[in-house]
Amino acid sequence: MNQDHPECDSEELTQNSPETDPLKVEVETLRGEIASIKADVLRERAELENQRKRLIRDVEQARKFANEKLLGELLPVFDSLDAGLTASGSEPSPLRDGLELTYKQLLKVATDNGLMLLDPVGQLFNPEHHQAISQTEVTDVEPGYVIQVFQKGYLLNERLLRPALVVVAKQD
């Protein structure tokens, strides 16, 4: 620096000021790019984590409901076994005992795989699980309660597989 000529110093300062120093400009530009890249990396990590969680949830749902088609196709078999037990009466016989044992074993296997039987006699009508096919006037039952089940309903892992077909009590 020249103390005798201050105008020279201001010229040098202007050339080396932060606004015009190419290195400082480049450093600031690179810092901005680094910050942008860091933000992009964080967004990508968050997206990957969300995809991983979605995949885990989808696999869990697929596993939970993989038997839905098979169990749905077994419902008529349950209906037939139930009808056979009803038709055989209440008197014990080897045929009735065998039919009942088969029904219970099949139902146990199905319940172990998430199937739940809906037999709502005496319960309040629930439109999410029951389908009313008629209403009947009854004096000894509160209105809105199920008094007869024509066809049992089923849930699979708390999701409706088939509604129960029911008769509901109504007011006189």
UniProtKB/Swiss-Prot annotation:
<keyword id="KW-0143">Chaperone</keyword>
<dbReference type="GO" id="GO:0051082">
    <property type="term" value="F:unfolded protein binding"/>
</dbReference>
<dbReference type="GO" id="GO:0051087">
    <property type="term" value="F:protein-folding chaperone binding"/>
</dbReference>
<keyword id="KW-0346">Stress response</keyword>
<comment type="function">
    <text>Participates actively in the response to hyperosmotic and heat shock by preventing the aggregation of stress-denatured proteins, in association with DnaK and GrpE. It is the nucleotide exchange factor for DnaK and may function as a thermosensor. Unfolded proteins bind initially to DnaJ; upon interaction with the DnaJ-bound protein, DnaK hydrolyzes its bound ATP, resulting in the formation of a stable complex. GrpE releases ADP from DnaK; ATP binding to DnaK triggers the release of the substrate protein, thus completing the reaction cycle.</text>
</comment>
<feature type="region of interest" description="Disordered">
    <location>
        <begin position="1"/>
        <end position="23"/>
    </location>
</feature>
<dbReference type="GO" id="GO:0000774">
    <property type="term" value="F:adenyl-nucleotide exchange factor activity"/>
</dbReference>
<dbReference type="GO" id="GO:0006457">
    <property type="term" value="P:protein folding"/>
</dbReference>
<comment type="subunit">
    <text>Homodimer.</text>
</comment>
<dbReference type="InterPro" id="IPR009012">
    <property type="entry name" value="GrpE_head"/>
</dbReference>
<dbReference type="Pfam" id="PF01025">
    <property type="entry name" value="GrpE"/>
</dbReference>
<protein>
    <recommendedName>
        <fullName>Protein GrpE</fullName>
    </recommendedName>
</protein>
<keyword id="KW-0963">Cytoplasm</keyword>
<comment type="similarity">
    <text>Belongs to the GrpE family.</text>
</comment>
<dbReference type="GO" id="GO:0042803">
    <property type="term" value="F:protein homodimerization activity"/>
</dbReference>
<dbReference type="InterPro" id="IPR000740">
    <property type="entry name" value="GrpE"/>
</dbReference>
<dbReference type="InterPro" id="IPR013805">
    <property type="entry name" value="GrpE_coiled_coil"/>
</dbReference>
<dbReference type="GO" id="GO:0005829">
    <property type="term" value="C:cytosol"/>
</dbReference>
